[in-house]
Amino acid sequence: MKQLLFTLLVILSFSNCTAQKPSYEDEIKLVQYELNTQYADTDKSPLTKEDLKSFKALEFFNIDKNYRIEASFELTPNTPIFEMQTTTDRLPLYRKYGIARFTLNGKELALSIYQNQKLMENIEYEDYLFIPFNDTTNGSSSYGGGRYIDINMPSEGSTTVVIDFNKAYNPYCAYNGKYSCPIPPSENKLAVAILAGVKAYGKHH
């Protein structure tokens, strides 16, 4: 925890010493700090009690702004509600909210964006959208079951959406088998390496 606190102080000190808006790198470092703080908290952490005893910090890919993508966005109205597969027999209800299209490393790619039907009833999450995805790093430098990105609903009439892979995080199942986690649909399998966001857990901790 001391290491996490030191990291936050460095970020805040740098930001306070300049009149400028915090840099993109500082923004992502703060996201990483908040995630590490959550995982170090015995009341909020998905880690097993045994892993929590030795937990210091999650491992991340280097921050790379090239993985902050401004994608074209297409709404998909009136798409059917469906049961998303999970790592257990739980089948949460989702609807495809839209499609994001972008180019990365010379490849034309697309990701479906989903809306959880239960969460949308909660005012706190009414604009929450979910992007589960797989990429070619899964099973090696990243978790084999894929990773997730959360975004806010684009403003009405928007034709673009920002997808920041530096904010990609692991399902709780990557840390503890007691959880039930959505499995990324096959349409969200990217044929590129996403060298951004959280790395696989358990290889170097």
Which residue ranges define each predicted feature?
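Bacterial Sec-dependent N-terminal signal peptides
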Residues: 1-23
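Start-of-domain marker
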Residues: 20-78
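Extended, aromatic/histidine-rich regions of cofactor-dependent oxidoreductases associated
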Residues: 21, 25, 168-205
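Intrinsic-disorder/low-complexity, polar/charged segments enriched in Ser/Thr/Lys/Arg/Asp/Glu/Gln
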Residues: 66-68, 97-99, 160-162, 189
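A mature extracytoplasmic/lumenal domain signature
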Residues: 73, 113-117, 135-137, 165-169, ...
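Mid-length scaffold segments of soluble, non-membrane domains
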Residues: 77-145
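Short, surface-exposed linear segments at secondary-structure transitions and domain or protein termini
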Residues: 118-126, 151-160, 202
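Acidic, glycine-rich flexible loop segments
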Residues: 130-169
